[in-house]
Amino acid sequence: MFRERIIVQDSLVADESGSAFRIRLPWYRALPLSTIEELSVTVDGTAFDPARLRIAVNDGEWALAEAQLRTDDVWFVLDDATVRLPGLVLDAGAHEVQATLSMRIPYLPVAGKPLSMAETDQKRMDVKELTA
């Protein structure tokens, strides 16, 4: 629905501990974190292990598997989430970042099951140094 707006342009940051970038919810209403079915990331053509990535929303940060259990934590449409890639140290310059986000829309049944949608966005961004 909003695939070209999933990755926030110019949000790629990095330091010696890893990298991060921001994403937006590809839907028009807030959804619980438990509706995330998949979040996959590739940087410069190399897939990052989804079991290692972390997602930060509101004032919390979780591994993807933990976030998928968070029924009471809501991702609001106007709030960016930060995707952290621990250990992925990037050199200065431009990098190709791709994210695929699959969400389950619990209140829209299709053939007796909640609607499931997957959107992919790709951006070329210059890495910025992560500041405290």
Curated annotation (Swiss-Prot):
Temperature dependence: Optimum temperature is around 40 degrees Celsius.
Regulation of activity: Activity is strongly reduced in the presence of chelating agents.
Cofactor dependence: Mg(2+)
Catalyses which reaction(s): 3'-dehydrocarminate + H(+) = kermesate + 1,5-anhydro-D-erythro-hex-1-en-3-ulose
E.C. code: 4.1.99.28
InterPro entries named in the record: CGDB (IPR045959)
Top-rank taxon, per record: Bacteria
Major enzyme class: lyase
Alphabetized GO MF terms: lyase activity
UniProt pH dependence: Optimum pH is 7.5.
Keywords: Carbohydrate metabolism, Lyase, Magnesium
A Pfam family the protein falls into: CGDB
Family according to the record: Belongs to the C-glycoside deglycosidase beta subunit family.
Known partners and oligomeric status: Heterodimer composed of an alpha subunit (CarB) and a beta subunit (CarC).
Function: Carbon-carbon bond-cleaving enzyme which participates in a carminate degradation pathway. Cleaves the C-C bond in 3'-dehydrocarminate to form kermesate. Also shows weak activity with other C-glycosides, such as 3''-dehydropuerarin (3''-oxo-puerarin), 3''-dehydroisoorientin (3''-oxo-homoorientin) and 3'-dehydromangiferin (3'-oxo-mangiferin).
Protein's name according to its UniProt entry: 3'-dehydrocarminate deglycosidase beta subunit
Organism: Microbacterium sp
Name of the encoding gene: carC
